[in-house]
Amino acid sequence: MSNTAGQVIKCRAAVAWEAGKPLVIEEVEVAPPQAGEVRLKILFTSLCHTDVYFWEAKGQTPLFPRIFGHEAGGIVESVGEGVTHLKPGDHALPVFTGECGECPHCKSEESNMCNLLRINTDRGVMINDNKSRFSIKGQPVHHFVGTSTFSEYTVVHAGCVAKINPDAPLDKVCILSCGICTGLGATVNVAKPKPGSSVAIFGLGAVGLAAAEGARMSGASRIIGVDLVSSRFELAKKFGVNEFVNPKDHDKPVQQVIAEMTDGGVDRAVECTGSIQAMISAFECVHDGWGVAVLVGVPKKDDAFKTHPMNFLNERTLKGTFYGNYKPRTDLPNVVEQYMKGELELEKFITHSIPFSEINKAFDYMLKGESIRCIIRMEE
């Protein structure tokens, strides 16, 4: 047991007091973990677009003050009662979704959508007692998706913590906690392209680049990037993209452009934007008879799309995915090993690295479109 186990820890956290306002480094009190919980010492964290979306709070109920952050790597400081798969000193990745191991989803080999620990962006408390483990001078501070990694210490449900190889560099593998696995798994676990096949990737942000990386790892020979920003093609080449289409450059639907490029359509398509039109295009650009399209991007609340039923009857398949179909505790350690073996290249996703005291720079980089992933070093 650590010498801080069972005690309240005072540490630094970047607190969002208001929507869209710069985070403030504050001293917070972090309560000990309760039954089924883990307290982690965060060493590295990174900024994901989801953090920015809920920090801006333009499309949902604001919940402040709040500690954001959900991509991170750290070390287990202490564990609550009943936690057996983790112990102090273990290297771990907290994840915004979880694996209770008991529900029908966890017992199914096909699903990772745990009934108990599935992501809940509106919940700012722990599920054990509906209370926060963070406070400032007695005032509770809300959690974010059960992780809140913009803090030197955080408390997470044990089912949302993946124990990993202690030799893995936390400043690299921390980015596997969300976006990279979401795109990577959408390709390798759901689309499953065969060696020598063709894959279209819609949207070349971090998730789309990760989907392209999955296509590269799978041995796809043609990886077609589709994006409205042509300058992204040069960067995407590092992730295996070898052809590029900007829909704005054509006077016909992009699915028709791709069909003409590929003699009837690509074998697989992965949509990573959340745009309804991109979803339609991704589905309609796959080849009849065997084509598979996978939707990753999150649409707006009231969005809906339509496509002709013949597109299905002609043996095209449309699938959706959540976190790349990875079970956090079971599968994430294996993804880390793929990196350790050199099969998965993470360094090329990391464009910036800053000290914790400069965390607001990470928001600036993302809002300007200058970063893929910015690593935030907790120890300065």
Swiss-Prot record:
It is an enzyme of class 1 (oxidoreductase). Its EC number is 1.1.1.1. Its cofactor is Zn(2+). Binds 2 Zn(2+) ions per subunit. Zn(2+) 1 binds at residues 48, 50, 70, 178. The gene is ADH1. GO terms for cellular component: cytosol. NAD(+) binds at residues 50, 203-208, 227, 232, 273, 296-298, 373. Belongs to the zinc-containing alcohol dehydrogenase family. It comes from Trifolium repens (Creeping white clover). Gene3D superfamilies: Medium-chain alcohol dehydrogenases, catalytic domain, NAD(P)-binding Rossmann-like Domain. An alcohol binds at residues 50, 70. This is Alcohol dehydrogenase 1. GO terms for biological process: formaldehyde catabolic process. Zn(2+) 2 binds at residues 100, 103, 106, 114. The lineage of its organism: Eukaryota, Viridiplantae, Streptophyta, Embryophyta, Tracheophyta.
